[in-house]
Each structure stands twice: as C-alpha cells, then as structure tokens.
Amino acid sequence: MVHLTPEEKTAVNALWGKVNVDAVGGEALGRLLVVYPWTQRFFESFGDLSSPDAVMGNPKVKAHGKKVLGAFSDGLAHLDNLKGTFSQLSELHCDKLHVDPENFRLLGNVLVCVLARNFGKEFTPQVQAAYQKVVAGVANALAHKYH
C-alpha cells in the first residue's frame, strides 16, 4: 500500500497519462542494464548487450521494458493493494527467476530519472516525491514473496 495525498495521486496519474509506455519502458530497462551491468545476467536470452548502444537499441530490451511498464500501470490503478497486484510477479521473480529484490528498487529509481528526463520542468520536486513513494511501494510489493 502506498500512502499518497489526494494531490499526489492526482499528480502521479496526470503525468502517467502522458507517458509513452513503449519508449519510457525501453529506456528505463535499458538504462538499468547499462548502469547496473550485473542485472544483465537475467537477460542473457536477449542477445547483444555488449555495449550501451547495443542495450539501448535491443528490441528485446524495449519489448520487455514495455511489459514492465504495463505492469507498473496496473500497479498505479491499484495503489491500495500493491502486494495483491504484484503477487504473481513477486512469486515468479523470487521462486523461478531468483532476481535479487534490490533490483526492483534500482529499476524504480531509474524509472524516476527517465521520467524526469522526459518531462523536464513538469516533473516538479512534488511529482518526484510522489513517484518515489510509488516506486518504493512497487519494489516492496515485488519483494514481498522474498520475506
């Protein structure tokens, strides 16, 4: 559960309505893989991840980033039940994929940076603070099955 004020909810949803999920998803996942290269081990089947340009141009990275942001969108629609919303994904990432739950926090922070880059002055400190709460809540929900 994420505790947002009514103003924060409005700001989060207003900005999210302008997000190009395809582009932002691919950019966020790509930047995660570039900045934190050890996360690439979970994506060995994606082909060439040998350089930042290869990662950022990789169609499988872009497609999976879109999928990730689709799940994030679902979370935004269910902020009062994030653990329930992400229960199956948490189980998959914990039991089958064995993803370090810290990676969820890293991806959330990268997403905030990508949103700031894409929205500039529209991504005010207040909007950033609200998004930090959301990505922390999503990361916590995804890590739930690890506890």
Curated annotation (Swiss-Prot):
Tissues showing expression: Red blood cells.
Positions of post-translational Phosphoserine modification: 51
InterPro entries assigned to the protein according to its UniProt record, in alphabetical order: Globin, Globin-like_sf, Globin/Proto, Hemoglobin_b, Hemoglobin_oxygen_transport
Protein family membership: Belongs to the globin family.
Keyword entries, A-Z: Heme, Iron, Metal-binding, Oxygen transport, Phosphoprotein, Transport
Classification via Pfam families: Globin
Cellular component annotations (GO), alphabetically ordered: blood microparticle; haptoglobin-hemoglobin complex; hemoglobin complex
Self-association and partners: Heterotetramer of two delta chains and two alpha chains.
Molecular functions per Gene Ontology: haptoglobin binding; heme binding; hemoglobin alpha binding; metal ion binding; organic acid binding; oxygen binding; oxygen carrier activity; peroxidase activity
SUPFAM superfamilies the UniProt entry points to: Globin-like
Any one biological process term the GO annotation gives: hydrogen peroxide catabolic process
Record bears the keyword Transport: yes
Species name: Hylobates lar (Lar gibbon)
Protein name per its UniProtKB record: Hemoglobin subunit delta
Residues the entry annotates as binding heme b: 64, 93
Globin domain segment(s): 3-147
